[in-house]
Amino acid sequence: MTVDDFLAEWHNADDFITAHTSGSTGTPKVIHLLKSDMLASARATNARFGIGARSRLLLCLSPDYIAGKMMIVRALDARARLTAIEPHRDLLADYHGDPFDFAAVIPAQAQTLADHPDRLARLATIIVGGGPVSPELESKLADLNANAYSTYGMTETCSHIAVRRIGIDRHYTTLAPTTVSADSRGCLVARMPHLSVGEVTTNDIVDILSATEFRWRGRIDNAINSGGVKIIPEELEREIADLLDVRYYIGRRPSPTWGEVPVLVVETTDMSDRRRDALLAALRTRLGIRAPRQIVTLARFEETPTGKVVRVDER
């Protein structure tokens, strides 16, 4: 989809836009988003980041997905200037024009910016969504004093409903007027009076700090019940970030003794027995009873169209 394609759909007689979920937590699905909801979401973001008619916005994501669609709607709402470029990882490699006030990027693009500070300097503010921000990327952006934010949201909420300043905050703060609480599972419940959906119950395990602040821990879908101990893979992944220099995630496999046990899945074709044994020992030292019992190597991780890693459990 091009910007013109989206604008044609935006200005047609329908009161909704067709969108696709990312598929990171299940099969991608087609949903209809009310244009009024998209405008309300855009206004919340524009208010939070001071986006107005004099702002210059960069569209570097495909309008096929909600993040790209919402950048266009933000520009429409604010009457801001929008520049669209090809949505590839090597961001701003050949761009030498005026700097931008605001852009939404995925983690792979943010990594490119962190590796090329001269390009990052052309963006006053970036929001990073579509996948988790790795500890390594967070550290790089913090060292560069980037005005960068990790976002929390989903297609169903018309993009993000909360943001976290990378390198400074450990918790997310909602965009007004959204408020949050937790259900009996410890999962986030978001109340959004400005959107027609009203309330969304998620599968994200959180610590609620206030009605507008929460700390994200991980997905309940990924949680591992090992001998009565609840293990949240995303927390382990953050704790061991300094032990690996390749992509990895914590998966699980069945165990006749413990029910389930964690497994470290690593994207590599080159791991010697010596390296494997040393890594398992380091994991036991770092994580104790939560440590993975096995290391599985994959030549390449499966990804969704938006670049999220698809977790595959051992069976």
What is each residue range found by the language model?
Residues 34-40, 56-112:
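AMP-binding/adenylate-forming
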